[in-house]
């Protein structure tokens, strides 16, 4: 008499198992030729931590915060070399000009929605001023990026609060990073499917330095989806200018690139440009209304800039230009895979006004990739 119950339980467990999203490599998709790090995440770069706050309330609040910390110390007092590359500048990335001028980061990076940027700035200022050793600080270059999640989220309600940002900063950790419709990716849309947060990494061989490049993305853009060179968007008949795609192509993509390679700001900008090439490989087109930005930084401790240093000169031990090509390839591969992970890990969400954005249909995608002999 227990057989019907047991059978129903098995069916339920099978359905749950089938419904669980899988990352690209979990599906047999192997993008590029370089191996990933242990977690295949930006946190494979030693010292980098990620924190997220997901805000889902009632029928219309679908937003959140994602933060990336370059190291566990006082970032203002020990600034890291950094660069920003603007692929298409229809966005509101706060802190850009000082990073470009001075070549460093002095705060964590915050990602949120467009109308939450000011809140992110206030939270980063509070966070910085409250740290020991910063009692005399009177200027903070808060770096806050955004995408517009207003299709699914009541963005005008400005539901992201300082406490949400501070919570993400407080709970930031290393190890695996949650992906999909979480944090700053809770309400985003990508290629007409549910977008979100994605991450990936690449590890160079020891003979090339053994360096790690990690990428985290917040995907909210459009185009013609490609996965590992396969025209998935066309096969699904859902793409920019296609008859079946109702969602507009305009959106944004924030890309954060971390590396432990000793790079100065000039070569970090060169690295950032390669991340944009990774976006292009997924079929993104950097449309007119898209804010596509790359923030790149190095965690190398010997390249940090002490805020209180009295030394008139700095010694530079950065990599030579000739050593950059393997890192370029790593950035391209990791960015491409991070974007695909953001799609595969996101689940269907219904939000503001009853709007529903479907997840990328993983089983159909697997079938398409098999057709093109791209599954391993």
Predicted regions and their residues:
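Bacterial Sec-dependent N-terminal signal peptides
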Residues: 1-21
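Alpha/propeptide regions of enzymes that mature by internal proteolysis
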Residues: 20-376
């Amino acid at each position: 008499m227990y057989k019907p119950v047991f059978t129903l339980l098995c069916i339920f467990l099978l359905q749950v198992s089938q419904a669980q999203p899988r990352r690209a490599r979990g599906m047999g998709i192997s993008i590029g030729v370089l191996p990933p790090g242990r977690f295949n995440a930006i946190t494979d770069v030693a010292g980098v931590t990620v924190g997220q706050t997901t805000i889902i309330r009632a029928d219309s609040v679908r937003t959140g915060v994602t933060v990336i910390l370059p190291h566990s110390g006082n970032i203002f007092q020990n600034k890291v070399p950094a660069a920003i590359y603007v692929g298409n500048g229809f966005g509101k990335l706060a802190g850009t000009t000082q990073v470009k001028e001075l070549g460093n980061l002095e705060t964590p990076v915050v990602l949120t929605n467009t109308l939450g940027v000011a809140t992110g700035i206030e939270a980063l200022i509070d966070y910085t001023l409250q740290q020991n050793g910063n009692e005399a600080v009177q200027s903070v270059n808060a770096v806050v990026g955004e995408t517009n999640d207003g299709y699914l989220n009541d963005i005008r309600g400005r539901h992201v609060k300082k406490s949400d940002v501070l919570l993400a900063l407080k709970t930031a950790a290393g190890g695996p990073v949650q992906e999909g419709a979480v944090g700053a990716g809770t309400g985003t849309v990508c290629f007409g499917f549910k977008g979100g947060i994605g991450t990936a990494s690449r590890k160079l061989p020891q003979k090339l330095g053994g360096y790690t490049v990690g990428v985290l993305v917040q995907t909210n853009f459009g185009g013609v989806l490609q996965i590992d060179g396969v025209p998935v968007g066309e096969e699904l008949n859902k793409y920019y200018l296609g008859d079946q795609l109702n969602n507009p192509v305009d959106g944004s993509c924030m890309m954060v690139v971390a590396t432990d390679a000793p790079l100065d700001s000039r070569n970090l900008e060169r690295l950032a440009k390669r991340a944009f090439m990774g976006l292009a490989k997924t079929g993104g087109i950097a449309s007119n209304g898209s804010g596509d930005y790359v923030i790149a930084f190095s965690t190398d401790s010997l390249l940090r800039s002490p805020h209180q240093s009295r030394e008139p000169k700095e010694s530079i031990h950065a990599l030579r230009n000739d050593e950059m090509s393997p890192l370029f390839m790593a950035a391209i591969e990791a960015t491409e895979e991070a974007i695909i992970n953001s799609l595969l890990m996101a689940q269907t969400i219904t939000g503001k006004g009853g709007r529903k954005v479907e997840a990328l249909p993983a089983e159909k995608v697997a079938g398409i990739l098999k057709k093109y002999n791209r599954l391993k």
